[in-house]
UniProtKB/Swiss-Prot annotation:
Record-level GO cellular component terms: photosystem II; plasma membrane-derived thylakoid membrane
Primary gene name: psbD1
Record's protein name: Photosystem II D2 protein 1
Source organism: Acaryochloris marina (strain MBIC 11017)
Residues that, per the record, bind chlorophyll a PD2: H196
Function according to Swiss-Prot or TrEMBL: Photosystem II (PSII) is a light-driven water:plastoquinone oxidoreductase that uses light energy to abstract electrons from H(2)O, generating O(2) and a proton gradient subsequently used for ATP formation. It consists of a core antenna complex that captures photons, and an electron transfer chain that converts photonic excitation into a charge separation. The D1/D2 (PsbA/PsbD) reaction center heterodimer binds P680, the primary electron donor of PSII as well as several subsequent electron acceptors. D2 is needed for assembly of a stable PSII complex.
Length: 351
């Protein structure tokens, strides 16, 4: 018998770090966590700081913090001033020159929150890839999460990059998001944009599929327990099915005449519909960033202008958009000092 005697091979720092990052713990860290956790912490922390203390007086002429009297629905971390263009607004940059108070007044926290937020989302997507690899499953969760990332990037980065400055991006707050919705409708007629329509169909369709699927599974659970609560009869490791696909198929065949007969196709469809909708929405936002127009039904507009008795929901909406632009712009872009005389303000066709 031969016995080999020798020292164990020394492990490099990379292997030691790899083992520590992937150690089994309550909250998995992983390599993705190096990006995810700091960026998520700083982005969320920046939002709480801004909504608590920081005014929007110097950028939007608004009160936007709890300190000034706003509430949860009206606080916001506001976009920088229009005059700052697409500056990264670094704390040590030429605008703030290391002055934290000045940096907050200029809107630096919006850049801080948004840019750390996008890298946090990318880190979360990488986390799903990493854990899928370690557990040994396919990475469709990460693929699905590309939808929210695409919308985030298109709304908060691509849209303002296509416009004159970060000022026109949504500020981080509830009512400030509503302001962005009204702005996008008034200036881009977004609801008539086919990509926005596909996005609405995808999100509402996904919600409908989710509700139908959940209800159908609950309807066709096997009677395999004695309790009034059916949840207690299920264990995650059981080999048996917990509901009857055959019965579900029969039910929907009677309702619609057609039904899913393949669970894999059914669940892929539930993935496909909302994610495709989110991708389509992101494409639409890039379009309006470049000021591409939605559908224009010019013949209806010409006839409505000539005939006071002819009006469609389309021409009515065009007038509403004119109103949004005329009355919103002086409030929204106070730095432009817009003054519109009475004769240029929109009026209904019949007046």
């Amino acid at each position: 018998m031969t016995i080999a005697v020798g020292r164990a091979q020394e492990r490099g720092w990379f292997d030691v770090l790899d083992d520590w990052l992937k150690r089994d713990r309550f909250v998995f860290i992983g390599w993705s966590g190096i990006l995810l956790f700091p960026c998520a912490f700083l982005s969320i922390g920046g939002w709480f700081t801004g909504t608590t203390f920081v005014t929007s007086w110097y950028t939007h002429g608004l009160a936007s913090s709890y300190l000034e009297g706003a509430n949860f629905l009206t606080v916001a971390v506001s976009t920088p001033a229009d005059s700052l263009g697409h500056s990264l607004l670094l704390l040590w940059g030429p605008e703030a020159q290391g002055d934290f108070t000045r940096w907050c007044q200029l809107g630096g926290l919006w850049n801080f929150t948004t840019l750390h937020g996008v890298f946090g989302l990318i880190g979360f997507m990488l986390r799903q890839f990493e854990i899928a690899r370690l557990v040994g499953v396919r990475p469709y969760n990460a693929v699905a999460f590309s939808g929210p990332i695409a919308v985030y990037v298109s709304v908060f980065l691509m849209y303002p990059l296509g416009q004159s400055s970060w000022f026109f991006a949504p500020s981080w707050g509830v009512t400030s998001i509503f302001r962005f919705l009204l702005f996008a409708q008034g200036f881009h007629n977004l609801t008539l944009n086919p990509f926005h329509m596909m996005g609405v169909a995808g999100i509402l369709g996904g919600a409908l599929l989710c509700a139908i699927h959940g209800a159908t599974v609950e309807n066709t659970l096997f009677e395999d327990g004695q309790d009034a609560n059916t949840f207690a009869a299920f264990t995650p490791t059981q080999a048996e099915e917990t509901y009857s696909m055959v019965t579900a198929n029969r039910f929907w065949s009677q309702i619609f005449g057609i039904a899913f007969s393949n669970k894999r196709w059914l669940h892929f469809f539930m993935l496909f519909v909302p994610v495709t909708g989110l991708w389509a929405s992101a494409i639409g936002l890039v379009g309006i960033a470049l000021n591409m127009r939605a559908y224009d039904f010019v013949s209806q507009e010409i006839r409505a202008a000539e005939d006071p008795e002819f009006e469609t929901f389309y021409t009515k909406n065009i007038l509403l958009n004119e109103g949004l632009r005329a009355w919103m712009a002086p409030q929204d872009q106070i730095h432009e000092n817009f003054i519109f005389p009475e004769e240029v303000l929109p009026r209904g066709n019949a007046l």
